């Protein structure tokens, strides 16, 4: 099942953040659109990709606690997305489990954006029949058999 994550985009009254901030399960960062993006939720709600007032309020409260000046920010947009996640919350990185040449790389959830480059390097090695730079056997699809 997927894991839903909601984020908000704010027009902040102060200069943009020059670095991304992470605290607890939350983050805030200024994106190239000039807006401050803050989030996120982790909701096990099946394929429901709708936004909720409760998530908005939770994200805003957390962001304002970390960055009090955001109390004056304007909410520009709230979005939700569905992230692929495995039952054990570890990604799948595997080859040779289907048609020749098929390599499976999925299930990293909200960490996918950070793990993607490393997962891609491992997947490329598996797809070309070479040894990945690190042992990825723990991420085999067979662990769910």
Predicted feature descriptions by range:
Residues 69-145:
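C-terminal catalytic lobe of FAD-dependent flavoproteins
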Residues 1-101:
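Active-site substrate-recognition segment that forms the wall
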């Amino acid at each position: 099942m997927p894991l839903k994550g909601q984020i908000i985009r704010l027009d902040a009254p102060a200069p943009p953040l020059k670095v991304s901030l992470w605290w607890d399960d939350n983050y805030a960062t200024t994106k190239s659109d000039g807006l401050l993006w803050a989030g996120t939720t982790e909701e096990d709600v099946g394929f429901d990709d709708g936004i909720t007032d409760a998530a908005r309020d939770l994200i805003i409260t957390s962001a304002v606690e970390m960055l009090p000046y955001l109390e004056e920010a304007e909410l520009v947009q709230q979005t939700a997305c569905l992230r692929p996640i495995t039952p054990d919350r570890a990604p799948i990185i595997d080859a040779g489990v289907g048609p020749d040449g098929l390599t499976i790389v999925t299930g990293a959830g909200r960490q996918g954006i950070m793990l993607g480059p490393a997962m891609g390097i491992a997947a490329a090695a598996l797809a070309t029949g070479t040894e990945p730079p690190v042992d990825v056997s723990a991420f085999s699809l067979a662990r769910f058999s």
